[in-house]
Regions:
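Ligand-binding cleft/hinge of the Venus flytrap
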Residues: 53-61, 105, 129, 139-163, ...
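Extended ligand-binding regions for polar small-molecule ligands
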Residues: 50-60, 133, 215-246
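Short helices/loops that flank or line small-molecule/ion binding pockets
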Residues: 72-84, 101-102, 163-187
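Sec/Tat signal peptide C-region and signal peptidase I cleavage site
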Residues: 15-23
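Bacterial N-terminal signal peptides that target proteins for export
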Residues: 1-8
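Acidic, polar ligand-binding/catalytic clefts
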Residues: 66-129, 140-143, 204-208
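Extracytoplasmic small-molecule ligand-binding "clamshell" domains
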Residues: 22-98, 159-160, 240
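Periplasmic-binding protein-like
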Residues: 30-32, 109-112, 195-231, 251
Length: 251
């Protein structure tokens, strides 16, 4: 009897270890990451990155566990180590924990734009065209390319909590403010909030923030076997055209 119990105990430990090894922890930014990560109160997950992660682990032995946090809180959790074998998205341009261990292939190219009210249109070529105006940014996100212009007084910095607040500021202060953000997020959230696209002037901001690629980002000590699996599946999604299909659903 003792031998049987001992055997069952070893089997349970082995199964538990397997279950833990098969678990992948996916980190989601609450509210501010649409269309890359879309969620409702930490549930009903979708979006470009989320759908890519779901497609990678579909019909596999891996279980994806979702963890949703406000952006700064998520970064703090990941910098402290987070759960084992975590996945989110990142870029070499972002630094910190979202740049330390990235997928072999990029998933999307980010373009930044300058959004202003169409009631007072102006042509933007460089930051001198923004002299005396205020640039609206989302709380929590850093923009190193803009810091020198805030520091020397070329423009003023204004922070808001979400996209709705950003667009409201533009509509209330035409000609005095402009919102800087990723083009994909700008367009998605205008549609999501059911605002008239004609109310806004959208211009390229690549002269200040050049276009760059984003990738899946992994925990620095991710299991090499799992990371290899993700890279292989991501390459398959790209070569089959499924990656482009996912992106087209949202942009």
């Amino acid at each position: 009897m003792k031998g049987l119990l001992r055997t069952l105990g070893f089997s349970f430990i082995a199964l538990s270890s397997y279950a833990m090894a098969s678990e992948v922890n996916y980190y989601v930014i609450a509210d501010q990451a649409r269309p890359f990560q879309i969620e409702q109160q930490g549930e009903q997950h979708s979006g470009i990155v989320t759908d890519i992660v779901s497609a990678i682990f579909a019909e596999s032995d891996y279980e994806v566990k979702y963890h949703t946090y406000p952006f700064k809180r998520m970064i703090s959790v990941l910098e402290a180590g987070g759960e084992e074998n975590w996945v989110t998205y990142g870029s070499p341009k972002w630094g910190k924990v979202q740049s330390e261990n990235l997928s072999e292939q990029p998933i999307y190219t980010v373009k930044h734009v300058l959004v202003s009210s169409s009631k007072a249109p102006f042509k933007f070529n460089d930051m001198q065209h923004m002299q005396g105006r205020s640039i609206v940014l989302l709380l929590g996100f850093d923009y190193p390319n803009l810091s020198p212009f805030f520091e020397n007084g070329t423009v003023n910095e204004m922070r808001v909590k979400d996209y709705e607040a950003a667009y409201r500021v533009l509509q209330r202060t035409p000609g005095d403010t402009a919102f800087v953000e990723m083009e994909s997020r700008v367009v998605y959230n205008i549609h999501h909030l059911e605002l008239p696209m004609g109310d806004f002037q959208i211009q390229s901001f690549s002269a200040v923030i050049p276009d760059y690629a984003i990738y899946l980002a992994f925990s620095p000590k991710m299991n090499p076997k799992e990371q290899s699996f993700i890279n292989k599946r991501l390459a398959e999604l790209k070569s089959s055209g499924k990656l482009d299909d996912i992106i087209k659903k949202y942009i």
